[in-house]
Amino acid sequence: MEFLVAQILSGVSLGGQYALIAIGYTMVYGILRLINFAHGDVFMCAGLMMVFMCASLPVYVSIPLMLVLTVLLGFAIERAAYKPLRSAPRMSVMISAIGVSYLLQNVALYATGGQPQTYPSLPFVSGTVTILGASTHWVTVITPVLVIVLVLLLQWLINHTKIGMAMRAVAKDFETSQLMGIKINKVISVTFIIGSFLAAVGSLLYFTNYPTVIPTSGAMPGLKAFVAAVFGGIGSIPGAVIGAFIIGICETLIKGTSMTVFSDAFTFALLIVILVVKPTGLFGEKATDKV
């Protein structure tokens, strides 16, 4: 029983970390109809920034600095790689996103010399706590609480602020929003900023559990977060969060059995099933092309 509780708690924690990445995917897709393949690498860069900054700065200085730099990185990627292609075919933008992904990985490879980097210990999340007889780390408890708080704040921003209203309008009809005078570039930049911030927070929690950072550290979490977004209905924030929690729990339960080698395969098998059975996901809306 204690083992099952520990696995479920770990799954909820992992799912919360995937959720913070998945929200970035689903928000960008909702606005631009773009799969930002570089998003997982922004997550990885946030982890590397913490490694390098904690080598010479206190943790309480490194964390806010890392959050700011990650946000600036996301903003810079949008301005340099996506904004010039705003009117280009979607394939061109997707290729640009893949190019940015490999660029970030190669910059990380150069910065680390190809050596795995040990993530610094964060004292406020690395302690242990006992829940229902199962011993687990504080990060396991903090993650779902933090995710819920951040999602509620994000939902408030989207539903009760001027920029949120603009984001909903652009997501509903990009061209009409432009004609109505909505500042499209500002809306898109804010979307990338929010997504990058949440990915940075996710990196703090994720690398506390998996404290080794390499240039490809963002690849698998990024892909799984993307699957979570598709599962929940890409473009739906609640859907992305629920999908991420389901994937995180299922993954850790599989890892607790003799079938642990298939824990990653399950996620991608789920993606195939979703695309065949319900392409719009759990909460997604069927899109219609305007003529």
Say what each PLM segment does.
Residues 18-20, 57-68, 192-199, 206-269:
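Transmembrane alpha-helical segments in multi-pass inner-membrane proteins
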Residues 47-52, 67-73, 100-108, 144-155, ...:
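Hydrophobic core segments of alpha-helical transmembrane domains in multi-pass membrane transport
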Residues 9, 31-76, 80, 257:
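Membrane-embedded helix boundary and interhelical linker motif in transport proteins
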Residues 84-160, 187, 253, 258, ...:
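Transmembrane helix-bundle core of multi-pass membrane transporters
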Residues 14-15, 134-213, 237-242:
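Helix-loop-helix "hairpin" substructures at the membrane interface of multi-pass membrane proteins
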Residues 58-100, 107, 242-247, 278-279:
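Alpha-helical transmembrane segments within multi-pass membrane transporters and channels
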